[in-house]
Amino acid sequence: MTIATPEIQQRVQQLRQQLQKANYAYYVLDNPIMEDSVYDQLYRELQDLESQYPILITPDSPTQRVGDQPAAQFNSIRHNIPLYSLENAFNLQELQKWEERWQRYDQVSNSDYVCELKIDGSALALTYEDGILIRGVTRGDGITGEEITQNVRTIRSIPLKLTLENPPSRVEIRGEAFLPLNEFDRLNGERKQAGEPLFANPRNAAAGTLRQLDSKVVSERRLQFFAYTLHLPEDNSLSSQWESLEWLKKMGFLVNPNCQLCPTLEAVADYFRHWETARHDLPYMTDGVVVKINDYALQNQLGFTQKFPRWAIALKYPAEEAPTRVKEIIVNVGRTGAVTPMAIMEPVHLGGTIVQRATLHNSDRVSELDIRVGDTVIIRKAGEIIPEVLRVLPELRLPNSRPYQMPSHCPECGSTLVRPVGEAVTRCVNSSCPAILRGSVVHWASRDALDIRGLGEKIVSLLVENELITSIADLYQLTPEKVAALDRMGTKSAQKLINAIEGSKRQSWPRVLYGLGIRYVGNVTAKLLTDNFPSVEVLSQASVPTLASVYGVGEEIAQSVFDWFKIVENQTLIEQLKIAGLQLENIASQAVSLTPSSGNIAGKTFVLTGTLPTLKRNEAKALIEKAGGKVTGSISSKTDYLVVGEEAGSKLAKAQELGITQLSEADLLKFLTN
């Protein structure tokens, strides 16, 4: 065996320290201190030295994250301290009752709380001796878990060696391993290409990954880990949960940056309400908030029930997945002629609302699910207005059920349905189809388009059924007398609607273009186009290459706009709208350039709050990101700008407290183009 000289030993130690610092900076601080190429070079040097001098290999070496051989099986390990479940609260009233309960139990009047986002992953218990990771164990049943140390080593945000000069002789760290959403999408994309079953959600993917016998597979899936508590059997110097979180950071762990110390239950409620919406901007799944009494002495006094700690509770968000039964399958024809199958279901509570229908997207999805009337299904709502069917439970299927067949003819007009080559969507191509007309008019009247108050789906349906309109332009030929003759429409209501329609003539050219409903043209794209093509005449004469040359407009959008203006019926519509007096060109005061300039935005961090006057939140986010900026969901010292709309929430107060610059939508648009 080759003997390692003191110089070699020193070099190995230097390499390990440099690589460990780089790992900590990259995975925990999110602040890289080393180029990838430099890291790879140092890693390879350490690997070569350890290969030449195996006696120098230690468990905390960065090269030992991935084991050479798959494990034959996992051993069961009994937890020194049980990993208890948490009692659940499903609304703020139940949270209030929990506080009243523990206060009665201990006769204490108040306490501050630590709020932590409840990560949807797998709980782990990690044991360190003299600062070195020696064991990683799953939660299991809370009493006994599986030892998966070899897999735990592959998680880059778990330090193999604690970053303390004098680490405790023994400490147990607890936290949650999870799969970030971008990794979940990547993993399922790869599995789909390989013809493998898809993971239902990131939690299942994380749990399945941790139980892989081959740690190389685990390493490739890029799990993350948030630490949330520690147990020091030989030291009781820590006095609070908040202090423990600070210690975890010093030890080299990634602690969720969105944890918050709340002085009262009202502050806890504010935290919960904020994240109920803001969680959809996070890069990982969270299904609630964990609320803990901060003071350890009080925790010890309260103790545990047989199942739960009395000093903590999980405040869950309204369910976003739920089972229900399919009563009927129908198809809906939209304004573009797209035929969307819909499942009509028994009512079920989901995401805080009662849901009775869910989208099935298209015929391919119907075939993939093999969904049938009478089936029990799991439906999901993750921020969408209309929930979707996630999966069917075939084991509960009725014996006489029949596969669903998509219709061959439009249920509205009877025309033969077509499926264009290369598309998943079946369409009705009859431009006179009542469903297409209804959808087009509703879109034209929508808030982001012409904003015609009072012209909703019911009134539009009456106008179409009574043949008072056959196109958008016919709206401007309506009279109060014709409208008043409709069911449940009196003279006053009719005049009010006519006034709203007349007022829509003053809406800007960008809104009119968006209202036309050209495929792929959202309101941001409409602003981009009308900035570069100041009138309908200029836009309608533009070639595909000219259209595509506009920043933010690609070939697909350009082709769609070009094709729309070549259709005779659409040319007629434009002429009728001109005669009616609609704004089909930019007025000088309306012309606002939306071509982002990366000079002012690149590298800056933005947070959005409240409702913006014209831009939707995802559109503002897209504009910022196109210009090289970053949009996050919460305020911190790293935030450069807060974009403020109407009904701004707690983010505004926090930004003012931190001295962060606030921008209106107008400020943002100027900033983008300056």
Curated annotation (Swiss-Prot):
Ligand binding (NAD(+)): 36-40, 85-86, 116, 139, 176, 292, 316
Catalytic EC class: ligase
Name of protein: DNA ligase
Record keywords, A-Z: DNA damage, DNA repair, DNA replication, Ligase, Magnesium, Manganese, Metal-binding, NAD, Zinc
Single Gene Ontology MF annotation: DNA ligase (NAD+) activity
Active-site residues annotated for this sequence: 118
Family: Belongs to the NAD-dependent DNA ligase family. LigA subfamily.
Function, as annotated: DNA ligase that catalyzes the formation of phosphodiester linkages between 5'-phosphoryl and 3'-hydroxyl groups in double-stranded DNA using NAD as a coenzyme and as the energy source for the reaction. It is essential for DNA replication and repair of damaged DNA.
Keyword set includes Transferase: no
Pfam families per UniProt: BRCT, DNA_ligase_aden, DNA_ligase_OB, DNA_ligase_ZBD, HHH_2, HHH_5, Nlig-Ia
GO biological process, one term: DNA replication
Catalytic activity annotation: NAD(+) + (deoxyribonucleotide)n-3'-hydroxyl + 5'-phospho-(deoxyribonucleotide)m = (deoxyribonucleotide)n+m + AMP + beta-nicotinamide D-nucleotide
Organism: Rippkaea orientalis (strain PCC 8801 / RF-1) (Cyanothece sp. (strain PCC 8801))
UniProt EC number: 6.5.1.2
Matches recorded under Gene3D superfamilies: 5' to 3' exonuclease, C-terminal subdomain (1.10.150.20), 6.20.10.30, BRCT domain (3.40.50.10190), DNA ligase/mRNA capping enzyme (3.30.470.30), Helix hairpin bin (1.10.287.610), Nucleic acid-binding proteins (2.40.50.140)
NCBIfam families per UniProt: dnlj (TIGR00575), PRK07956.1 (NF005932)
Matching PROSITE patterns: BRCT, DNA_LIGASE_N1
InterPro entries: BRCT_dom, BRCT_dom_sf, DisA/LigA_HHH, DNA_ligase, DNA_ligase_AS, DNAligase_adenylation, DNAligase_N, Hlx-hairpin-Hlx_DNA-bd_motif
SUPFAM superfamilies registered for this protein in UniProt: BRCT domain, DNA ligase/mRNA capping enzyme, catalytic domain, Nucleic acid-binding proteins, RuvA domain 2-like
Cofactor(s) for this UniProt protein: Mg(2+); Mn(2+)
Domain BRCT: residue ranges: 596-674
